[in-house]
Amino acid sequence: MDTQKDVQPPKQQPMIYICGECHTENEIKSRDPIRCRECGYRIMYKKRTKRLVVFDAR
């Protein structure tokens, strides 16, 4: 009855961030420093998802 062994952890996928200075796309994993690979700028913006997002008005 060990169901914990059957459950696999989610795979670490890199998120895509856009540099605030040079506007290049950077793939950043969970342990990577938040820094542009091209210019070294530290302000990064998360890229908008392509998945459909629906908000319910209440």
Curated annotation (Swiss-Prot):
Zn(2+) binds at residues 19, 22, 36, 39. GO terms for biological process: regulation of transcription by RNA polymerase I; transcription by RNA polymerase II; transcription by RNA polymerase III. Its main location: nucleus. GO terms for cellular component: cytosol; nucleoplasm; nucleus; RNA polymerase I complex; RNA polymerase II, core complex; RNA polymerase III complex. GO terms for molecular function: DNA binding; DNA-directed RNA polymerase activity; zinc ion binding. SMART domains: RPOLCX (SM00659). InterPro entries: RNAP_P/RPABC4, RPABC4, RPABC4/Spt4. It is found in: Nucleus; Nucleus, Nucleolus. Keywords: DNA-directed RNA polymerase, Metal-binding, Nucleus, Transcription, Zinc, Zinc-finger. Belongs to the archaeal Rpo12/eukaryotic RPC10 RNA polymerase subunit family. DNA-dependent RNA polymerase catalyzes the transcription of DNA into RNA using the four ribonucleoside triphosphates as substrates. Common component of RNA polymerases I, II and III which synthesize ribosomal RNA precursors, mRNA precursors and many functional non-coding RNAs, and a small RNAs, such as 5S rRNA and tRNAs, respectively. Component of the RNA polymerase I (Pol I), RNA polymerase II (Pol II) and RNA polymerase III (Pol III) complexes consisting of at least 13, 12 and 17 subunits, respectively. Pol I complex consists of a ten-subunit catalytic core composed of POLR1A/RPA1, POLR1B/RPA2, POLR1C/RPAC1, POLR1D/RPAC2, POLR1H/RPA12, POLR2E/RPABC1, POLR2F/RPABC2, POLR2H/RPABC3, POLR2K/RPABC4 and POLR2L/RPABC5; a mobile stalk subunit POLR1F/RPA43 protruding from the core and additional subunits homologous to general transcription factors POLR1E/RPA49 and POLR1G/RPA34. This is DNA-directed RNA polymerases I, II, and III subunit RPABC4. The gene is POLR2K.
